[in-house]
């Protein structure tokens, strides 16, 4: 289990350094959960960049969709043999224990991340416009922030509202940073 979390920390540090630094600012008891969630985000975000074949990216993303079902399912379920899936399963069930376990909202947010990336992979052309980009940023980055807030015990409408705006801003900034000139 420890090596799975170490893998998550390494992946986030290597591929999303800003998020790594932000996660270090969280209280110690919430860092591993946040790192597992952020590593999940890294893995799903890199699915498209890992191959030039869209169908292979879709296969990888559908695998992550199944991994979410296992990670957010029954506590006794066995996650797929991938360090991020193992850490995600453990972190979700440990951190969400105080709120009655992993619920529908957690599955909804995790699935929103994967589903948005699947829709992106299925596009044969550039995104159709700003509303698509806003929705994509909301479903990927804002959903991730909702999960982290919830894992930290923050259940507040104002915090969720701020996370929605911040998630869209981070998502659009990342899209712009990755755009080719």
Predicted regions and their residues:
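Acidic catalytic motifs of isoprenoid enzymes
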Residues: 1-168, 172-181
